[in-house]
Amino acid sequence: MRCPFCRGDDSRVVDSREVEDGQAIRRRRSCSGCGRRFTTIEELVLSVVKRSGVTEPFSREKVVRGVARACQGRPVEEDALQQLAHQVEDTVRSLGVSELPSHEVGLAILGPLRELDEVAYLRFASVYRAFSSVEDFEKEIADLRSLRGAARLPEGPEAAQGGPESKAGNGQAAGSGDPEGVKAEKSSE
């Protein structure tokens, strides 16, 4: 590594650490010629290949801007957008490639955005997947509803038996007309 001070070619690594959650390596170096120390940061340059064939460096800020447009008017904090962009970057870096198509970045955005805000997800998906009809929206909404329903299914032995509460959800024991049934049932637990 060439010294930035004396331009000498001989330097040695004094310290080496991972930074940015392991996405880069920070090395502290010492020049054998002038004795001065300097720091280098090594990271994998992640490039995105656009549909036009143009290659550009991955930009977390560009992910934030794109998702922010989809979240316009929605109750989504800037911090949540930054976290989503970081999650997307981690996902695409974990693929282990130095170049990836922009399509892969879009796929990496969809999952976290769906969990962040469903309306913003629909907006983003409509552009990303080029929805061309109302039916495309209806299908995506139906998919969202089925995912939401699957995520909220009760678990455990009470779920199989219908649980201790009535279907009305009023806190009364099933088959009981008064709240005393709840107290008696809870005290026997």
From Swiss-Prot:
Residues 180-189 have a biased composition (Basic and acidic residues). Residues 152-189 are annotated as: Disordered. GO terms for molecular function: ATP binding; DNA binding; zinc ion binding. A zinc finger (unnamed) spans 3-34. Disulfide bonds: none annotated. Keywords: ATP-binding, DNA-binding, Metal-binding, Nucleotide-binding, Repressor, Transcription, Transcription regulation, Zinc, Zinc-finger. Residues 46-136 form the ATP-cone domain. One of its GO terms (biological process) is negative regulation of DNA-templated transcription. HAMAP family: NrdR (MF_00440). This is Transcriptional repressor NrdR. The lineage of its organism: Bacteria, Bacillati, Actinomycetota, Actinomycetes, Pseudonocardiales.
